A protein has these predicted regions:
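Glycoside hydrolase catalytic-domain context in secreted enzymes
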Residues: 1-716, 725-741
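Short beta-strand segments
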Residues: 703-705, 744-746, 814, 858-861
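Short, surface-exposed beta-strand/beta-hairpin micro-motifs centered on an aromatic residue
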Residues: 704, 722-724, 838-840
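Short beta-strand elements
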Residues: 741-754, 862-865
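Extracytoplasmic soluble-region selector
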Residues: 755-865
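Charged, amphipathic alpha-helical segments
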Residues: 715-721, 785-787
Length: 865
């Protein structure tokens, strides 16, 4: 490719074809968090978006599953894996060329075109504050739970086994994990800085990214709008290159968030008015100019921001106008970018596209056999309902008025009248980036249909009570509804949140029950019928500490997909015994929450009670991991055979879970580890280190559970030593029903040092394309990955700017001057490499040069012309 052609391939929207090279027109930006939401390339293929027809543009819509926050409350990685497989099936189904006589997802003029397969999902930022407007996209507040759930999602999405191995040799579709990193505020998100120390950055905010890079081999990453400690994430060399690529071993493509290159140079609130080290910005917003502090040379800040983003590793510009030939040529001319950096970016992008089978004969790619019939198939419809049933959390279930029998489940044969109140009960709130299904079931529909299927004579009355999440006037109950409530066998009060309260670009100001919903609750409660269920469907925590005593039973879900009403009905009726467990702490009220801009977690650093179950010292409405069942379970027989271990060992934990109730059911047993107190550090109270969802246990049945904890996973980043350390001391292993309710515990003494072992080796030379006769020294530095962090803005980091870097399991970089490195060329007719890492190009062609450090290898392509 020419430089102009290369540049044209490094943005995401309507990337032009190059017919002479067999490259089709392409569109990277597709959305599919919990159902195919949008394939923006359809705009170029006859589709016309409208407010009435969002989602997949055209007449064919897709199955919508529960949002990630809901799915993770199943605590069932296998269920999420099946959901993701179904979503990616539908993504491939939209590439069926028979759809509307041509592929709905087919771009360009080449006969070989069969669409694009890169999707901006999943969101794996941690839900550290319930007010965040995108909480529904997350897998919860815990990094460990998120890691396992997100890995299952990526594996299912990309056509891999549950342990991350490719099933066919091809990517089914390419997942793009977002947003890297510390993207947890919507208000002014393009202009704010998320400030944090390395301990929290590594141990909490990016640990789930590390896991899915290493274990699920996610194909793509998306950087975030925010800055991190003053340096825009999109151009942050430490964050993107050193952490994601060279420490965690990420080798896929990295895209900016859409329009995020602009945040490098524009003024607040649209950007950070940033300039790279050695440069000064005139801070004139969209027209800003950088001036070199030594030479006085100038360059447009748009060109500078684009150059430093690519240098950091953000190879794709999503939706921005900065990736132009002029900007790139200006950056190269002034010396802040090189053709070699462009080549490397292009290589990572096309490598992922090749893995989807785009450049292979379609008959060789098994996924091309997936047809349009999978879209909204009966199988997927049933899976959406199954998923929704498994995410519902039973928060409370008491007996009424001194009776013995608990209110739930409902015995439909003994019910004559049910009243449902609340406008949300007749709405289907799907959440951010939802599929647009043709089939949906709201709560009123689901409850009516399921009840009348058992007892056709049941009367189901509904009134919205003029309730709304945005209303500022009291709810109104009609006299008829009041009388119906007084005489009803059961009253269901449906409350929660919707997109009017919280969404992308808009955080909640408060976790208080929104609008006039509390007004409705108080009026219903005053009528004296105690047979009441509070059904909450919300983006996360809503304040209920003043109202929960009104209700013997409370059921919660987040936005629960297209079959949310059917799933709720099945749980209320007992057709499905609830087994969901909270993946966040249900705080009492706003006074327990620090300022959203404070990214720290500990009580001392947040100036309050701390964030998440790991550090929170207050009393919550419900703890992390909480969830009831219509049955009861007992954990017993905890056994840990080895009580003295080193950081190189694993701790084997076993116990029994017995259904002591009268109904079949499932539960989630949870393993927490409480670390010792360490002088000078605020350690977490405990951390989740294992869990097991049981099978459906019959009354009296016992399941034996075995869990294993790698002691190395108990390490914490030590800023002084610039590595992760497992501290000596006594650790308490706790097995329980939730973070607060521990059934049993046992102490394990951990002593010694973690033995450093190389985990990743990376090669990043300044160029990839060479002429015959050149000599390249691999034992040198790459000037293009020099830090983009302005001195004084951050604490000291280790530096990883060598061409060859090797990282250990403790996050430290190997001192290569004292290491044994073995080099190899895959084709010595193209290039040779000496024992000292000197490469000599000897013939035209392509070869891979690898470096092996302590038995672990990494490599890069060398192209010789």
């Amino acid at each position: 490719m020419t430089l102009s052609e290369e540049i044209s391939q490094l943005h995401t929207n309507k990337v032009p074809s190059i017919p002479r090279l067999g490259v089709q027109e392409y569109y990277y930006w597709s959305e599919g968090q919990h159902g195919i939401y949008a394939m923006f390339g359809n705009l170029q293929n006859g589709g016309q978006p409208s407010n009435a027809d969002i989602g997949v543009y055209g007449d064919t819509h897709s199955t919508c599953f529960p949002v990630n926050l809901a799915m993770a409350m199943s605590w069932d990685p296998e269920l999420i894996y099946r959901e993701a497989k179904a979503i990616s099936d539908e993504a491939r189904g939209f590439v069926d060329k028979s759809l509307f006589g041509k592929s709905q997802n087919n771009l360009g003029e080449l006969k070989t075109n069969y669409g694009y397969l890169t999707y901006w999902a999943p969101t794996i930022n941690l839900n550290r504050d319930p007010r965040w407007g995108r909480s529904d996209e997350t897998f919860g507040e815990d990094a460990y739970l998120t890691s396992l759930m997100a890995a299952a999602y990526v594996n299912g999405y990309q056509g891999q086994t549950m342990d991350g191995k490719s099933e066919t040799g091809y990517l089914k579709i390419a997942a793009t994990a977002k947003h890297f990193a510390l993207n947890n505020i919507e208000n002014n998100r393009q202009g704010i800085s998320s400030n944090i120390n390395d301990e929290a950055l590594r141990d909490y905010y990016t640990s789930q990214f590390k896991y899915i890079i290493e274990q699920a081999h996610v194909a793509g990453l998306m950087t975030s709008y925010n800055a991190v400690n003053g340096t825009p994430a999109v151009a942050n060399t430490y964050l993107v290159n050193q952490l994601a690529q060279r420490t965690y071993g990420f080798d896929g493509y990295i895209t900016s968030d859409c329009g995020a290159i602009r945040t490098t140079y524009d003024n607040f609130p649209l950007g950070h008015a940033w300039a790279a080290p050695g440069w000064t910005s005139d801070r004139k917003g969209y027209s800003a100019v950088w001036t070199n502090n030594e030479t006085g040379k100038t360059i447009s800040a748009a060109a500078g921001g684009q150059a430093y983003a690519i240098r950091a590793g953000t190879c794709l510009n999503c939706g921005g106008g900065e990736s132009t030939v002029k900007n790139i040529e200006d950056a190269i001319k002034i010396g802040i970018l090189s053709k070699g950096v462009i080549d490397r970016a292009l290589t990572t992008v096309f490598t992922v596209r090749m893995k989807t089978g785009e450049f292979d004969p379609p008959e060789d790619v098994v996924y091309t056999k997936i047809k349009k019939d999978v879209i909204q198939s009966k199988k997927h419809q049933l899976l959406a309902e199954e998923a929704a049933e498994n995410t519902l959390v039973l928060l409370k279930n008491d007996a009424v008025d001194g009776t013995i029998k608990k209110l739930l489940p409902i015995d439909a044969s003994k019910i004559h009248k049910i009243v449902i109140v609340g406008d949300l009960a007749k709405k289907v709130t799907l959440g951010g980036y939802s599929g647009e299904p043709d089939f949906t079931v709201n709560a009123v529909q689901g409850i009516s249909e399921k009840l009348k299927a058992v007892n056709p004579n049941i009367a189901v009355d509904f009134e919205d009570t003029h309730s709304a999440t945005t209303s500022t006037i009291p709810a109104v109950l009609s006299e008829k509804t009041k009388e119906n409530i007084k005489s009803a066998d059961l009253v269901i009060v449906f409350v929660g949140t919707d997109e009017q309260v919280s969404h992308e670009d808009y955080d909640r100001a408060s976790i208080a029950m929104p609008g006039n919903l509390n007004s409705m609750i108080y009026q219903v409660a005053a009528l004296g019928n105690h047979n009441m269920v509070l059904a909450i469907q919300a983006i996360g925590t809503v304040q209920i500490n003043f109202i929960k005593d009104f209700f013997p039973a409370i059921v919660y879900s987040s936005y629960n997909g297209q079959s949310q009403g059917a799933a709720l009905a099945n749980v209320l009726l007992g057709k499905k015994n609830p087994s969901g467990h909270l993946n966040f702490t249900w705080y009492l009220d706003d006074t327990q929450l620090p300022d959203m801009s404070n990214y720290y977690l500990t009580p001392k650093q947040t100036g309050g009670l701390g964030r998440t179950y790991m550090h929170f010292l207050g009393k919550s409405s419900f703890p992390f991991g909480y969830g009831l069942s219509y049955s009861q379970f007992k954990i017993s027989q905890l056994k840990i055979l080895t009580k003295d271990v080193t950081p190189d060992d694993s701790v084997k934990v076993s116990f029994d879970v017995t259904n002591t109730g009268t109904l079949p059911g499932e539960t989630v047993s949870q393993l927490y580890v409480a670390p010792p107190e360490i002088k000078g550090k605020q350690m977490p109270v405990k951390k989740l280190q294992g869990f097991q969802k049981t099978k459906n246990l019959q009354p009296g049945e016992t399941q034996h559970v075995n869990l294993s904890v790698s002691v190395a996973d108990l390490a914490f980043w030590n800023q002084k030593e610039l590595k992760s350390v497992v501290y000596d001391g006594v650790y308490r292993f706790q097995i329980g029903y939730n973070a607060n309710e521990i059934a049993d515990s046992s102490e394990v003494n951990i002593q010694g040092k973690l033995t450093p072992k190389v985990t990743h080796v990376t090669l990043c030379p300044e160029d990839l394309v060479y002429q015959v006769g050149e000599t390249i020294n691999l034992q040198s530095k790459n000037k293009w990955i020099k830090s983009s962090i302005n001195p004084g803005l951050e604490e000291q980091h280790s530096v990883a700017d060598n061409v060859v870097e090797a990282v250990n399991n403790d996050g430290s970089f190997v001192d290569l001057a004292n290491a044994q490195i073995k080099y190899r060329s895959a084709d010595i007719l193209v290039a040779t490499v000496s024992d000292l890492g000197v490469v000599k190009t000897v013939g035209k062609g392509i070869t891979t040069i690898t470096a092996t450090v302590n038995g672990v290898s990494g490599g890069t392509v060398f192209i010789v012309k």
